[in-house]
């Protein structure tokens, strides 16, 4: 049984207390800003179809972009570890560009830049009967290729954590290099890759809000539109507080899923027990500095 975590208990009790305190402030005592907490609670407890669509789009974009990032990360890591110098140069340049420039600039350039320069017009695409507008395609592509640069370093660190003798033994048994990587090296590297991969997806859920610059109607844009129209207009505090709570809920759900995945993949590095849910949410546990599972993409 895990010991009692006072800091976790304080946070768990403090968040509801803060919300109740805010709910009690039905009016501004100075009479400057007319709070309407019904907007806040309705956005959380009775979300409109528009909010639900924004949540669905946020999660869908995050999952799709993360999958693209993982695929690019695997190829990028293999490229950086390859013996062929063209592959190493290509992978290094890819990581250098997409880790060295702001994601917001990349999103703007890949959508508006390519569109205005008439390099690519981002026409609507129909996938499995679902129409994807151009800005959603551009957003997924931008988030995916940016994430791939960080996943390259994460996958590379995972591969390097596996003893080279494993690959040599597999090759001596007649396995080809791709087969040895797929059957021997990558499964062992998974327990080192999974923790930072989960953290990257947690960050991806929040990073989707940057797609506001190309008008993708994800969760943040949905609340921004609600703030400018109808009965909820000009109530930014209540609306964006509700938006923050929704993002917090999404990342908390993912943290729970991530904790179970890490326990399933392995019992931690070097026999150490993987962090629990409270440790993951509130940072109550001190990690070893030499633990490769804590390697991140260096954001």
Residue ranges and their predicted role:
Residues 2-299:
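Transmembrane alpha-helices and adjacent helix-loop boundaries
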């Amino acid at each position: 049984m895990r010991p009692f975590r006072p800091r976790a208990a304080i946070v768990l009790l403090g968040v509801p207390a803060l919300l109740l305190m805010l709910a009690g402030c039905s009016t501004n005592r100075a009479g400057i800003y007319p709070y309407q907490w019904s907007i806040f609670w309705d956005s959380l407890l009775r979300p409109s179809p528009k909010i639900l669509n924004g949540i669905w789009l946020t999660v869908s974009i995050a999952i799709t972009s993360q999958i693209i990032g993982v695929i690019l990360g695997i190829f990028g890591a293999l490229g950086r570890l390859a013996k062929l110098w063209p592959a190493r140069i290509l992978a290094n340049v890819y990581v250098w560009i997409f880790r060295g420039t702001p994601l917001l600039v990349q999103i703007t350039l890949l959508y508006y830049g390519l569109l205005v320069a008439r390099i690519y017009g981002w026409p609507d695409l129909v996938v499995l009967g679902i129409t994807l507008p151009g800005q959603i395609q551009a957003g997924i592509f931008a988030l995916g290729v940016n994430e791939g640069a960080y996943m390259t370093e994460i996958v590379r660190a995972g591969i390097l954590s596996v003893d080279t003798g494993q690959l040599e033994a597999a090759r001596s048994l007649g396995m080809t290099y791709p087969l040895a990587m797929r059957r021997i090296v990558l499964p062992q590297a998974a327990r080192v890759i999974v923790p930072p991969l989960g953290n990257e997806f947690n960050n991806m859920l929040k990073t989707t809000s940057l797609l506001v610059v190309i008008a993708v109607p994800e969760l943040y844009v949905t609340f921004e539109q609600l703030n400018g129209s109808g009965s909820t207009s000009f109530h930014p505090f209540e609306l964006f507080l509700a938006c923050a709570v929704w993002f917090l809920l999404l990342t908390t759900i993912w943290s729970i899923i991530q904790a179970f995945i890490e326990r399933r993949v392995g019992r931690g590095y070097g026999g150490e027990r993987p962090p629990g849910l409270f440790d993951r949410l509130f940072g109550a546990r001190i990690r070893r500095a030499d633990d490769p599972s804590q390697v991140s993409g260096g954001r």
